[in-house]
UniProtKB/Swiss-Prot annotation:
It comes from Streptomyces kanamyceticus. InterPro entries: Fungal_Metabolite_Diox, Phytyl_CoA_dOase-like. The lineage of its organism: Bacteria, Bacillati, Actinomycetota, Actinomycetes, Kitasatosporales. It comes from the Bacteria. Gene3D superfamilies: q2cbj1_9rhob like domain. Mediates the conversion of kanamycin B into 2'-dehydrokanamycin A during the transformation of kanamycin B to kanamycin A. Its cofactor is Fe cation. It catalyses: kanamycin B + 2-oxoglutarate + O2 = 2'-dehydrokanamycin A + succinate + NH4(+) + CO2. The gene is kanJ. This is Kanamycin B dioxygenase.
Length: 285
């Protein structure tokens, strides 16, 4: 189902000056995530930040595409691409956003930590991905609370034309035995059962928004019918007990990253960090 705007039942409207949610707004955000598995926070980030990140990722794209093995998620045109981790492009309002952490701490606990700093590029002419989840249910067939929340940052206006993601609200709680294949893709019979009850939605997402979603939410990348790449920055917050490799960050940001109570699972290194040819253990879509 294609919509003209983010649906009201999934959305909170904010401004870049909002540093905390009042109790009523926090309760609403948590209720949206619990019921639907996806929350759209519009107006969160200043466009001067997203503009710089977008430009840097687009500048890197030719080098990514020259690699012998381009990191592709499922089908052609969906390229996993990490953003630069230079000090000048690591923004506290993005990496340590107080409203984002207020929400993820409320769901995952005060020791939750970000362990992903990645992204993707949906290229013109891309194919349709299979419906999938990014993170598995830990105990198949058993209902359990979330252990991770994906934090997605559109770096341009996402439109129906340029490949705004398809989401399946409420699917994060669906955990029957044998629902998924070995890649985390939803089996066709399960898709049709869910479609009859709650069909998927797609909608424009304005730049400056942040999308928080349960890592188990069904979703897929769709074809980019525009003439320009569609970049996304992606992070994932996990409960402190879930083991993940650390993000590689330059030691020049250690003081403000490590000094924050908004935790980042990071390894700090001297000099430049190779963000283009390192391992890509996460299938961020």
């Amino acid at each position: 189902m294609a919509l003209a705007a983010p649906p009201g039942e999934l959305t909170l409207a904010l401004t870049p000056d909002d540093k905390t949610l009042d109790p009523a707004s926090l309760d609403r955000a948590l209720a949206i995530l619990a019921e639907h598995g996806i929350l759209v926070l519009t107006g969160m980030l200043r466009t001067r930040l997203t503009d710089q990140l977008r430009t840097a990722m687009l500048d890197d794209l030719p080098e990514v595409l020259r690699q012998q093995d381009v990191p592709t998620n499922f089908v052609p045109g969906h390229v996993q691409q990490d953003p630069p981790v230079r000090e000048s492009l690591l923004f506290p309002d993005v990496l340590l956003n107080p409203v984002v952490y207020q929400i993820t701490h409320a769901v995952l606990g005060a020791d939750a930590r970000n362990a992903v700093y990645s992204g993707n590029m949906n290229l013109p002419g891309s194919h349709e991905q299979p419906v999938h989840l990014d993170e598995p249910h830990l105990w198949p067939g058993i209902s359990h609370p979330p252990y991770c929340l994906c934090v997605d940052v559109p770096l341009i206006d996402f439109t129906l034309e340029n490949g705004s993601t398809e989401y399946w609200p409420g699917s994060h709680v669906l955990n029957p035995d044998e629902c998924y294949d070995e890649r985390g893709c939803v089996l066709p019979a399960e898709l049709e059962r869910r479609r009859a009850v709650a069909p998927p939605v797609r909608f424009p997402i304005p730049v400056g928004s942040v999308v928080i979603r349960d890592g188990r939410l069904w979703h897929r990348g769709v074809p980019n019918l525009s003439a320009a790449p569609r970049p996304l920055l992606a992070m994932t917050h996990y409960t402190e007990w879930f083991d993940m490799p650390p993000i590689q960050l330059p030691d020049t940001v250690k003081s403000w990253v490590d000094g924050s109570d908004r935790h980042t699972h990071a390894h700090f290194v001297a000099g430049d960090v190779d963000h283009l040819t390192g391992d890509h253990p996460f299938a961020v879509r």
